[in-house]
């Protein structure tokens, strides 16, 4: 076995900011099981489905993830006082009780190291970014996100990196995937723990060296993002609002392939 393969085997790929069609806010066209299929193909070990203002809690998806060796962490992307934050290993009841950053501090005081909170896309002008307020609320966060959308001079992550260095806060790369093809290129790698548990993943994120994979956006990526943000998604959202919510029925067949619509 080559040294590169040995080295790769000692690390686990994780993505802690992903959306699926379960999202109550955005119109997503791929399912949690389709995400699991792709994650397995690409060798991911840890995922978090971060619905907007809701905790992903579908027990069958957690069971199916575990069956293929993927640790799925319950999570949510919550907007507080106009700013998005991502909370990992939280319950729906805990998220429902969050209205202010002071509530976040109280939650952290109760839960300690058993939760992990990071600031997504903090200095991007769209999408509920926390902006300069991050400096005031930095004690609420365990990490700062390295946003996937960057190219050349278009890179607000530079400001995020300065804040992270100033406060000694780790940065983590994520995909923030809203389309399935966007998943898999932007992620964080952690040293492989002896046992793959939420506790060990959080400890690695806080204390271990991290590898961040986040290549610059290509011209195709830029065009796709602009099309999605300003054309495709607003159209799908209006169409869904006119039609009303729809629900899919889980398949009774076995295997992830049979569950790709859920």
Where are these regions (language model features)?
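Glycine-centered short loops/turns at secondary-structure junctions
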Residues: 43, 69, 112-114, 168
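Short, charged N-terminal beta->alpha structural module
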Residues: 102-112
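Short, well-ordered beta-to-alpha junction loops that form the rim of enzyme active sites
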Residues: 52, 120-122, 175-177
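Short acidic (Asp/Glu) patches
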Residues: 98-99
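Divalent metal-dependent hydrolysis catalytic cores, especially in the metallo-beta-lactamase
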Residues: 36-56, 116-118
């Amino acid at each position: 076995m080559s040294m590169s393969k040995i080295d790769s085997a000692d690390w686990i790929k994780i993505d802690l900011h992903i959306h699926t069609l379960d999202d109550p806010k955005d119109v997503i066209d791929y399912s949690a099981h389709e995400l699991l299929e792709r994650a397995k193909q690409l060798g991911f070990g840890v995922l978090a489905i971060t619905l907007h203002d809701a905790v992903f809690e579908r027990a069958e998806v957690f069971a199916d993830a575990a069956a293929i060796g993927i640790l799925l962490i319950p999570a949510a992307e919550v907007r507080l006082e106009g700013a998005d934050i991502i909370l990992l290993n939280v319950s729906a009841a805990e998220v429902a009780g969050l209205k202010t950053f002071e509530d976040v501090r109280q939650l952290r005081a109760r839960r300690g190291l058993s939760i992990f909170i990071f600031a997504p896309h903090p200095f991007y002008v769209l999408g509920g970014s926390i902006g300069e307020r991050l400096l005031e609320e930095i004690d609420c966060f365990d990490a700062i996100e390295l946003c996937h959308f960057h190219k050349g001079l278009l890179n607000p992550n530079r400001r995020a990196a300065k804040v992270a260095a100033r406060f000694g806060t780790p940065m983590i790369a994520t995909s923030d995937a809203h389309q399935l093809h966007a998943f898999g290129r932007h992620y964080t790698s952690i040293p492989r723990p002896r046992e793959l548990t939420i506790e060990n993943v959080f400890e690695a994120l806080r204390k271990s060296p991290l590898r961040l994979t986040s290549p610059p956006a290509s011209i195709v990526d830029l065009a796709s993002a602009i099309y999605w943000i300003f054309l495709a998604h607003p159209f799908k959202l209006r169409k869904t609002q006119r039609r009303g919510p729809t629900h899919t029925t889980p398949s009774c067949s076995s295997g992830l392939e049979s569950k790709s619509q859920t």
